[in-house]
UniProtKB/Swiss-Prot annotation:
This is Uncharacterized lipoprotein GfcB. It comes from Escherichia coli (strain K12). Residues 1-15 form the signal peptide. GO terms for cellular component: plasma membrane. Disulfide bonds: none annotated. The lineage of its organism: Bacteria, Pseudomonadati, Pseudomonadota, Gammaproteobacteria, Enterobacterales. PROSITE patterns: PROKAR_LIPOPROTEIN (PS51257). InterPro entries: GfcB, YmcC_sf. A lipid is attached at C16 (N-palmitoyl cysteine). A lipid is attached at C16 (S-diacylglycerol cysteine).
Length: 214
């Protein structure tokens, strides 16, 4: 994931303000000792970009900036063209990572598309294709959502009251079960934090949307 971290430098090295240069220094320090990256709340608020913290496969937490939005999908880019594609917190595709999510079908029926309307027992079925250790794998996934209560998250210095939804996921071939969790802003319906799997029960992905995509 080092290329993703390095990609942030390119956004700030040209024409840095004092605050932005301080942020680059933070990235450099974290990069070389493998610490989780933490950006000061005021620096996050000052940036004109949508941003998130990302942790892949229990590795180092990094700071990612939104590249662009296309067909309602948020595309988070690195300097070497690695990319993550999300829609309201749901990971839909990755490109040029060590292991990649290649396809998710039936994404239009994902209950997270209208997160404030999710109810206990909401269901979703889709097929996924991913690469893992240089092998292509596929599975059919079936999900059931359950409400886990309210929780207030402190995100970039602001308290956000969230509906917490647990997504119980079952896959066939391979036969696996696991749980994804989504924290949905109770006012806007935007997913502000998530824990989910890239593949069928493998490769955990954690995202905290500091300034969510519009």
């Amino acid at each position: 994931m080092r290329p993703l971290i390095l990609s942030i430098f390119a956004l700030f090295l040209a024409g840095c303000t004092h605050s932005q240069q301080s942020m680059v220094d933070t990235f450099r320090a974290s990069l070389f000792d493998n610490q989780d990256i933490t950006v000061a709340d005021q620096q996050i608020q000052a940036l004109p970009y949508s941003t998130m913290y990302l942790r892949l496969n229990e590795g180092q937490r990094i700071f990612v900036v939104l590249g662009y939005i296309e067909q309602e999908q948020s595309k988070w880019l690195s300097q070497d063209n690695a990319m993550l594609v999300t829609h309201n917190g749901r990971l839909l595709k990755t490109v040029k990572l060590n292991n990649n999510l290649l396809e998710v079908t039936n994404s239009g029926q994902d209950p997270l598309r209208n997160a404030l309307a999710i109810k206990d027992g909401s269901r979703w079925t889709r097929d996924i294709l991913w690469s893992e250790d240089n092998h292509f794998r596929s599975a059919t996934l079936s999900s059931t959502f359950s409400f886990a209560g309210l929780e207030t998250l402190n995100i970039a210095g602001r308290n956000v009251l969230c509906n917490v939804w647990q997504e119980e996921v079952t896959s066939t071939r391979p036969e696996k079960q696991w749980q994804n969790t989504f924290w949905v802003d109770s006012a806007t319906g935007q997913v502000r934090q998530s824990r989910q799997m890239l593949g069928a029960g493998v490769i955990p992905v954690e995202m905290t949307f500091l300034k969510p995509a519009p």
